[in-house]
Curated annotation (Swiss-Prot):
NCBIfam families: PRK00062.1
Pathway: Porphyrin-containing compound metabolism; protoporphyrin-IX biosynthesis; 5-aminolevulinate from L-glutamyl-tRNA(Glu): step 2/2
GO terms for biological process, alphabetical: protoporphyrinogen IX biosynthetic process
Protein name, UniProt field: Glutamate-1-semialdehyde 2,1-aminomutase
Catalytic activity: (S)-4-amino-5-oxopentanoate = 5-aminolevulinate
Length: 455
């Protein structure tokens, strides 16, 4: 028995399923989760001393790699001054200023820069950020209904688990037990990338729809970018109805571009370009905390000022803006310069090419989807129109992934334990770590090709 197995058995005695987030349990790939005890640069090390190239990267935050010395030092310095005060600190303002300044695209032909984030509220988790965004949208508009897309994951609050991605997709759950029907009925789910479906819902329920929420680029059912012009038209539809557009950048924010997916999608576009779009509210998480629990909700000042203490929409948190966590986030964002994003894109380019080469040589049918440096793949022949929604993602040959995953793991590469999750590269990946992944791919591809569907 490995030490990881022994530790996992011990965990299951006192923690439901042995994990504190379901996808970590290896439920869709089988086997025993590795108990990780150390992370540095592009590597993680398990309780048995085995080192892995990490393509999970804490599910996104570790864009610089693990335990970057400057981030560790900032955390130590902040902790030495106090772990938390229950009061506002200057660092919270610095982080809010950094985000409002960073999330912009340059103006075109002399026009001013476009900045969708006028004010920011810090919270601790992405779930809190999206939950607050929904409450704020309802409070601002005086309406009750929410429109979301099938396969999009916005955290585990009651309003947002219907036909969600991430762990809900991994476990093939319709949502979650424990959500009252009355609450579920306030969320209308439509197919992703289907504007006609959105228009139909608006036509039927328009006066009651407070907001449309969308992942800026879907990345919790695998990576599925919006079709060209989709989000711009979605914004027009929402705004024409008096509804808000909420862009969930918990996963994509500050990972795929210095200004998040909004910056990637709007770069070089004038404000009046037909493909340009501006959300009313944006949620952030993961990278903004640099590996510690920080998330945020930002957007239009007139909407944000409806939050207490200025407005009637209540939100609070004992650990919101925790100084140690904010120090990690501030330092990470300050270090995440243009060179970091070039490194992320180059690493993604190299690995995507290597995956395609290995899959082609193994005779696998597949497709690769990408948004910036985020990418994933689906097994099986994709439909003619490509992978564009939750239904096409779910139709893939998911049964090939466990064999692929465990072959990579056995060769020292840690991948997400679900085919419905993105691969996360880091700027710490060097020639040696990339080479280990590349060398592991051919055998893993052959294992996937040899896999058979369950009886």
């Amino acid at each position: 028995m490995t030490h990881s197995q022994d530790l996992f058995d011990r965990a299951r005695d006192v923690i439901p399923g042995g994990v504190n987030s379901p996808v970590r349990a290896f439920g869709s790939v089988g086997g025993t989760p590795r108990m990780m005890v150390k992370a540095a640069g592009p590597y993680v090390t398990d309780a048995d001393g085995v080192e892995y190239v990490d393509l999970v990267n804490s599910w996104g935050p570790a864009i610089l790699g693990h335990a970057r010395p400057e981030v560790v030092q900032a955390v130590q310095d902040a902790a030495a001054l106090g772990l938390g005060f229950g009061a506002t600190t200057p660092a919270e303002t610095e982080l809010a200023e950094l985000v409002t300044d960073r999330v912009r695209v340059a103006g075109v032909d002399g026009s001013p820069d476009r900045r969708p984030i006028e004010k920011l509220r810090l919270v601790s988790t992405g779930t809190e950020a999206t939950m607050t965004a929904i409450r704020l949208a309802r409070g601002f508009t005086g309406r009750d209904l929410l429109v979301k897309f099938a396969g999009h994951y916005h955290g585990h609050s009651d309003s947002l688990l219907a036909e969600a991605g991430s762990g809900v997709a991994t476990l093939a759950l319709p949502g979650s037990a424990g959500i009252p029907e009355a609450i579920a009925a306030q969320t209308i789910v439509v197919p992703y990338n289907d504007l006609d479906a959105v228009r139909a819902v608006i036509a039927e329920h328009g006066p009651r729809i407070a907001a449309v929420i969308t992942e800026a680029a879907a990345a919790n059912m695998g990576v599925v970018p919006p079709l060209p012009g989709f989000t711009a038209e979605l914004a027009r539809i929402a705004h024409d109805n008096g509804s808000l557009l909420i862009s969930d950048e918990v996963l994509t924010g500050f990972r795929v571009h210095p200004a998040g997916y909004w910056g990637l999608d709007n770069a070089g576009l004038a404000a009046d370009h037909p493909d340009a779009w501006t959300p009313d509210l944006v949620t952030y998480g993961k990278v903004i905390g640099g590996g510690l629990p920080v998330a945020a909700l930002g957007g239009r000042a007139d909407v944000m000022d409806h939050l207490a203490p200025l407005g009637p929409v209540y939100q609070a948190g004992t650990l919101s803006g925790n100084p140690v966590a904010v120090a990690a986030g501030l330092t990470t964002l300050r270090l995440a310069d243009a060179g970091v994003y070039r490194a992320l894109d180059i690493a993604a380019d190299i690995l995507i090419y290597a995956v395609e080469l290995a899959f082609d040589r193994a005779g696998l049918a597949y497709s690769v989807q990408r948004a910036g440096s985020l990418f994933s793949f689906t097994f099986g022949t994709p439909p003619e129109h490509g992978i564009t929604d939750y239904a096409t993602v779910q139709a893939q040959e998911t049964w090939r992934y466990p064999a692929f995953f465990h072959s990579m793991l056995d060769q020292g590469v840690s991948l997400p334990p679900s085919v419905f999750e993105a691969w996360f590269v880091s700027a710490a990946m060097d020639e040696a770590s990339l080479d280990r992944v590349i060398r592991a791919l051919p055998a893993a591809a052959r294992a996937a090709a040899a896999a058979t569907p369950p009886a």
